[in-house]
């Protein structure tokens, strides 16, 4: 063919749209950080390598924070912290301890079939939403984004709570029917319906909860927040199974909590390669363990 010098430019039909790829790599790499954060960035890099997660610090998390539609999340560089490096370091130290509770390849298995995405964790300065959350998980492209407020006193339970949300997100992506709602509802009191609105609790929010009832057979939920919806119910159970040894043992005296945990454990085993796993922390107190 003969090119025409003055012809209008037309995109080739063979051209590849790289916009999504550009977004992926931009979110993966983050932005350069100031020298004052280099030490915590180096620590985060080591955790990424050890556990198979991605960690974004300070301004690196800005784009991910802005992608959340139901909360306003402030990055640590914009939160007016008196010592940003120290605040981030505290959270990373707790994150290190918490991630070590999970099987070696657990988080790598949460990536897609191409090895992309997975769990991305971000220490943030503040989360503003209807329930004043101290942790939040959202999905974006192939990522399960976990945001943790650096100002809280104890991180481990919150991190485990949000890791369950990320785990459930991956499970449902692989098999939407992994949790049979009718089976789950049979683990709840007769006639019970989740409130579905944490900002407007039920008239008797403590009923049937571990911190209110005296008899194990009357306990169906960890606390009032667990009565919000099935996902928060499951996340509360896993939070205490993973991060609170004393409460976990007491919770397992409840037949309903045992049944719920068994359903959760089955969903994990059905959607992860567990052949190399042993002594799973979340299964250690099950009657069959």
Predicted region positions:
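Non-catalytic architectural context of zinc metalloproteases
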Residues: 3-90, 200-215, 231, 264, ...
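Hydrophobic, Leu/Ile/Phe/Ala-enriched alpha-helical segments that form helix-helix packing faces
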Residues: 47, 95-110, 163, 167, ...
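Auxiliary, metal-adjacent structural segments of Zn-dependent hydrolase domains
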Residues: 55, 72-141, 152
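Active-site-flanking segments in enzyme catalytic domains
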Residues: 114-289
């Amino acid at each position: 063919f003969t090119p025409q010098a003055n012809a209008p430019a037309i995109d080739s039909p063979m051209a590849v749209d790289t916009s999504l790829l550009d977004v992926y790599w931009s979110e993966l790499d983050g932005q350069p950080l100031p020298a004052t954060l280099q030490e915590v960035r180096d620590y985060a890099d080591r955790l990424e390598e050890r556990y198979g997660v991605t960690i974004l610090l300070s301004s690196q998390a800005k784009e991910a924070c802005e992608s959340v539609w139901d909360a306003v999340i402030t990055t640590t560089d914009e939160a007016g912290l008196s010592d940003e490096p120290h605040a981030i370091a505290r959270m990373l130290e707790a994150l290190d301890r918490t991630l070590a509770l999970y099987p070696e390849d657990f988080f790598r298995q949460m990536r897609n079939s191409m090895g992309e995405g997975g769990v991305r964790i971000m220490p943030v300065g503040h989360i503003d939403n209807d329930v004043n959350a101290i942790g939040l998980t959202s999905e974006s492209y192939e990522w399960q984004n976990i945001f943790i407020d650096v100002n809280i006193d104890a991180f481990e339970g919150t991190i485990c709570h949000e890791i369950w949300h990320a785990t459930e997100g991956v499970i449902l992506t692989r098999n939407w029917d992994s949790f049979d709602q009718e089976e789950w509802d049979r683990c709840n009191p007769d006639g019970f319906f989740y409130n579905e609105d944490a900002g407007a609790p039920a008239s008797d929010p403590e009923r049937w909860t571990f911190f209110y009832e005296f008899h194990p057979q009357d306990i169906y939920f960890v606390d009032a927040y667990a009565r919000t919806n099935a996902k928060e119910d499951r996340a509360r159970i896993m939070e205490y199974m993973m991060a609170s040894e004393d409460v976990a043992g007491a919770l397992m005296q409840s037949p309903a909590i045992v049944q719920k945990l068994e359903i959760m454990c089955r969903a994990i085993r059905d959607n992860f390669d567990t052949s190399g796993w042993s002594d799973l922390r979340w299964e250690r107190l099950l009657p069959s363990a």
